[in-house]
UniProtKB/Swiss-Prot annotation:
The gene is pyrE. Orotate binds at residues 113, 141. Its cofactor is Mg(2+). GO terms for molecular function: magnesium ion binding; orotate phosphoribosyltransferase activity. Catalyzes the transfer of a ribosyl phosphate group from 5-phosphoribose 1-diphosphate to orotate, leading to the formation of orotidine monophosphate (OMP). It comes from the Archaea. InterPro entries: OPRT (IPR023031), Or_phspho_trans_dom (IPR004467), PRibTrfase_dom (IPR000836), PRTase-like (IPR029057). Its EC number is 2.4.2.10. This is Orotate phosphoribosyltransferase.
Amino acid sequence: MLKEDLINSGAIKFGDFVLTSGKRSGYYIDIKSAYTDPKILDEIGLEISGMVKSGKIAGMELGSVPILVSVSIKTKRPFVIIRKDDLKHGTRKRYIGSINLNEEIDIIDDVATTGGSIMKAAEIIRNNGGIVKRAICVVDREEGAAEMLKENNIELYSIIKASELR
C-alpha cells in the first residue's frame, strides 16, 4: 500500500524544515525522493489515474513531471508542464504542451500545503484559455490548500492526508 511504502522509503522526515510555501514544519514529505523508486511511482500513477476526470493533465516543473508521465502513460492522456518562471529564450512560453480554448485540464501535484503552486499552475492554464476545476495531489498536508483552492473554484483530491502519516 502506498502509505506504508512512503513511510518505509523514508519519504516522511521529522525535524525542522522550511516548506516551499515558506512555512516552517516539524515534518517533511519528500515525494520526489520516494518516486525515484519505480514501484512507488507506479503506485502513485495508478492511484492518480483513477482520479483524473479531464482529457488532459498538467503540473508544475519539476515535482509533478514524473507523476504526469506515469499518469499519461496509464491513461493515454496528454500532459502540460507548467514552468515555474518565465522562459528567457526560445518561445518564452510558460508551459510545454498545448492548452486549447475551453479545454478542461486536471492539475497534478506531489504535495499540497497552501495550494500556492497549484493556483499558480491554474492561473497560467486559465490565462491561456483552459479550464481548471480539479487538482489531485499525492499528499494533502491539510494546511489550507483545499480551502484556498475551493475559493478559486478548484476541488482538491488527494491519495493521502498528512494526518494519516503521523
